[in-house]
């Protein structure tokens, strides 16, 4: 706790007493340190450095092929650069006598190819974070990419439970059964406290939010408790433990963080993650300070704070001290040699693993797959993108090649397309697209086999059910955001976003869809890449009972029962080529496989498609210019919304009723006044 220094009042007697003490102490060799504090309060300073959503980006990236040690380049992030930035701030703060905490708000795992090492028995990310001196991390949704059992193995490999002494893993609203390894081995904790050098006691807890928990594919028996109720309990426990300052490490997103701050008093700081928001200024919700540092290690967050020992208030000091809230991690930072050595060690292991799972076709994450002079972009949000088209085309054409059967439609969700694909820009890397860049964008998840990446599944749906898919994606993106936006190959459609939802029932928060947000849908019947000019399309009509061959990410299929249980009018029945229903508990029957039984992964399809592009003069495949932009596959239009028509009809009805009532009253009055 804080020690409060008395405030001396200046008077003649006091000056005499002090003078006497100083004279005596000078003879006795006693040194007395008298501190003066402005005003009538004492403040204790401390600093929180923070990251979130680093997604296994151990090396500088975007593009990774541009990075060369010691050279200026446009690549961002990298654990060794980040470590240098942290060390520099720690050194400065140490000279000033100011303690520093280093925190990560989850999703340190999953996304870049280094995450694949988890399946090979390594815990690269967390071991490096320990070496960098992280005080605490929380568990996000992507730590569950390979399932709760694999997460437990990962934490054990990282040295837990003993490693809590280095880096606490806080997951306060996570509830694993007592016999599950996560709980049985004490692999996560509910709370933690840090006694800082200046006497300040900081309490911390970690939560995963509603949206983050919802997008986890597989948790087994692990459950997530109500975030707000858990937070209230954690705040109370930490106060009982004597915490001066309470920090919530939250993997929830800014909107949920603001809601948490409104609903749960006593949280001084929320260090956030999940929505990949770069907050260049802190958000103040009531008295709670909210921060977030973007994603992929592009920034290190720096939050300068002061704790008032008299009032218990915490205030932000960044503006007065002038450090930015976010520090770009770029080539201006050299690599910490110890951390860089660890990264290089794991890179060699990853290269050997890639050689194994690609049957020797690739043996280095920096192997060139193709070339382009443009970025295959994954933005803007909630819109057709060039990368979305490239990925879905890859899925459609490669499955067609694998099976020998025409694939009518391929679809993939934005949530599983992680990042734009950046070709190299330096003299040594110009135009190069490496294996790393492709897998970084498409290599999340795993299937039922032991290999990384989400498998591709093949289903047959009626034309009416394809319309249901379109209506469902419009509904999900409306309520749950960009991760649920679907990209398509072999199809184009137009829709009015204002018609996705007719209304929402307030008490149960249940959306009532119009099922008429899609204004038109067309199937591409030509060969090769679908045209931009409208040639080769036929209408895909509502009520069409013909079967169409659709391929998608198997993970995506698992969301169908969740939606159709709530909205049976949008029912989708997954079928095989003979039209026979195949329930999703038999999803293995729907997965596309190699001749040896291995699953065909999304990332594999994209790599195969990239290498199949026509070669340039240097013999390297060149990505078609078609993918430099979008192709008019998904078109947003604006028409008068259904709810507007409904309101208009109600107004007409009410007006008619009022008119009839007034007319009847007028008629009655006329009858009463008529002479007898």
Describe the role of every protein-language-model region.
Residues 2-33, 653-659:
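Secretory targeting signatures
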Residues 13, 19, 224, 361, ...:
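Generic alpha-helix initiation/capping and coil-helix boundary signal
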Residues 4, 120, 177-179, 266, ...:
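Short secondary-structure boundary micro-motifs
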Residues 39-51, 56-60, 64-85, 131, ...:
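Catalytic centers of hydrolytic enzymes
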Residues 2, 11, 27, 37, ...:
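Intrinsically disordered, low-complexity segments enriched in small/polar residues
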Residues 22, 108-109, 218, 285, ...:
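General secondary-structure edge motif
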Residues 1, 22, 151-152, 159-160, ...:
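Charge-rich, low-complexity amphipathic helices
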Residues 34-332, 387, 391-394, 410, ...:
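Acidic, metal/ion-coordinating pockets
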């Amino acid at each position: 706790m804080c020690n409060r220094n008395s405030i001396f009042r200046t008077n003649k007697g006091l000056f005499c007493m002090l003078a006497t003490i100083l004279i005596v102490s000078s003879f006795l060799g006693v040194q007395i340190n008298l501190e003066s504090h402005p005003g009538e309060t004492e403040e204790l300073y401390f600093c929180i450095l923070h990251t979130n959503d680093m997604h296994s980006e151990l090396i500088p990236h975007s593009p990774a092929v541009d990075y060369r040690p010691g050279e200026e380049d446009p690549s961002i992030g990298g654990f060794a650069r980040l470590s240098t930035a942290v060390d520099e701030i720690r050194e400065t703060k140490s000279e000033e006598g100011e303690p520093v905490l280093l925190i990560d708000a989850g999703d340190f795992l999953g996304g870049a190819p280094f995450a694949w090492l988890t399946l090979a028995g390594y815990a690269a990310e967390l071991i490096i974070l320990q070496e960098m001196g992280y005080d605490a991390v929380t568990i996000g949704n992507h730590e569950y990419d390979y399932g709760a059992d694999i997460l437990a193995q990962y934490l054990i490999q990282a040295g837990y439970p003993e490693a809590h002494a280095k880096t606490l893993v806080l997951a306060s609203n996570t509830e694993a059964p007592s016999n599950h390894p996560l709980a049985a081995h004490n692999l996560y904790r509910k709370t933690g406290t840090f006694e800082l050098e200046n006497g300040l006691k900081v309490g911390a807890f970690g939560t995963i939010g509603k949206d983050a928990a919802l997008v986890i594919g597989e948790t087994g028996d692990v459950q997530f408790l109500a975030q707000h109720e858990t937070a209230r309990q954690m705040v109370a426990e930490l106060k009982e433990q004597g915490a001066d300052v309470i920090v919530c490490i939250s993997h929830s997103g800014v909107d949920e963080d603001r809601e948490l701050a409104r609903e749960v008093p006593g949280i001084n700081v929320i260090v956030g993650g999940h929505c990949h928001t770069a907050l260049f200024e802190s958000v103040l919700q009531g008295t709670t300070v909210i921060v977030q540092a973007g994603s992929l290690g592009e920034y290190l967050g720096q939050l300068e704070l002061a704790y008032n020992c008299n009032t218990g208030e915490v205030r932000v000091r960044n503006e007065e001290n002038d450090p930015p809230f976010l520090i770009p991690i770029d080539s201006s930072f050299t690599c910490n040699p110890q951390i860089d050595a660890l990264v290089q060690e794991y890179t060699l292991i990853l290269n050997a693993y890639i050689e194994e799972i690609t049957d020797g076709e690739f043996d280095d994450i920096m192997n060139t797959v193709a070339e382009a002079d443009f970025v295959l972009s994954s933005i803007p949000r909630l819109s057709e993108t060039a990368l979305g088209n490239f990925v879905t085309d890859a899925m459609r054409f490669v499955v067609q090649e694998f099976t020998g059967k025409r694939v009518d439609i391929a679809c993939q969700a934005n949530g599983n397309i992680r990042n734009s694909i950046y070709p190299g820009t330096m003299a040594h890397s110009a135009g190069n697209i490496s294996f790393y860049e492709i897998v970084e964008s498409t290599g999340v998840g795993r299937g039922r086999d032991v290999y990384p990446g989400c498998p591709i599944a093949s289903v047959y749906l009626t034309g009416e059910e394809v319309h249901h898919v379109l209506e469902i994606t419009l509904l999900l993106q409306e309520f749950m955001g960009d991760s649920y936006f679907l990209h398509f190959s072999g199809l184009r459609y137009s829709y009015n976003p204002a018609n996705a939802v007719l209304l929402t029932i307030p008490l149960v928060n249940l959306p009532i869809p119009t099922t008429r947000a899609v204004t038109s849908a067309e199937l591409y019947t030509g060969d090769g890449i679908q045209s931009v000019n409208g040639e080769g399309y036929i209408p895909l009509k509502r009520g069409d009972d013909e079967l169409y061959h659709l391929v998608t990410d198997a993970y995506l299929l698992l969301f169908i029962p969740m939606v159709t249980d709530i909205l049976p009018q949008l029912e989708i029945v997954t079928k095989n080529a003979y039209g026979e229903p195949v329930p999703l508990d038999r999803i293995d029957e729907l997965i596309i496989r190699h001749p040896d039984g291995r699953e065909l992964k999304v990332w594999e399809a994209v790599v195969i498609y990239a290498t199949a592009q026509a070669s340039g003069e240097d013999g390297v495949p060149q990505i078609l210019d078609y993918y430099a932009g979008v192709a008019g596959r998904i078109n947003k239009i604006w028409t008068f919304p259904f709810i507007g028509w409904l309101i208009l009809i109600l107004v007409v009805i009410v007006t008619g009723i009022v008119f009839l009532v007034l007319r009847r009253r007028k008629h009655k009055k006329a009858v009463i006044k008529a002479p007898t």
